[in-house]
Amino acid sequence: ESVNVVHRWLPRAISGNYGVEKYLLELTRHRPRDIIQLFNELKQQSTGGRLSEQQVLSAEKRYSRDYLLLEMQDEVRGLLSDELSRVAFDAVFSIRKAEFSLEEAYRAGEEFNLKPEDVIQILRQLFDCGTIGMKDLSGVGGHTTFKYRNPGAVFSTRGVQYILHRGIRQAANIASV
């Protein structure tokens, strides 16, 4: 007899309207090691039996803060200069929103003494490593693109809002939209 461990050990939905499978997958970059680490955090929350929604949210917070943010910071460290990699996440997190415009990123960059071209370089590298995605503002429904979902995706500064990966919003103390 096959057993669906997700349905057996986890709540069916999170926040009332998200199916737990989709919710958990959106916290990762669809990499096996991300998924394994998330499930390790879920296992740490277990006290026996089905996990509560609160236990899942606690696991999400630990995964976000103690794993995914550090992984993304390590990736960016190899793509940006030391100076830019030190301020990249602080600048984006200082916007205090899950979705933000290029103009908001420029204003945040000014607070960190970044030139506009530095802000673009940071956003490009954050996009390439999956920290941010782009939401198309020109079409109906606002199609969202993340590089890890579409490896052929190209960074843009036109007609888009940037969206912070759901998996690191807890680490940034930013509410999900």
Features from the language model and the residues they span:
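The catalytic "switch" region of P-loop NTPases
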Residues: 1-17
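Winged-helix-like regulatory helical subdomains adjacent to P-loop NTPase cores
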Residues: 17, 25-116
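Generic signature of intrinsically disordered, low-complexity, basic-rich segments
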Residues: 81-84, 125, 163, 167
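Transmembrane catalytic cores of multi-pass membrane glycosyltransferases
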Residues: 102-104, 128, 144
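Short amphipathic alpha-helical interaction segments
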Residues: 112-129, 134
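Short, Lys/Arg-rich nucleic-acid/phosphate-binding segment
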Residues: 136-143
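Short, amphipathic alpha-helical interaction segments positioned at domain boundaries
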Residues: 145-177
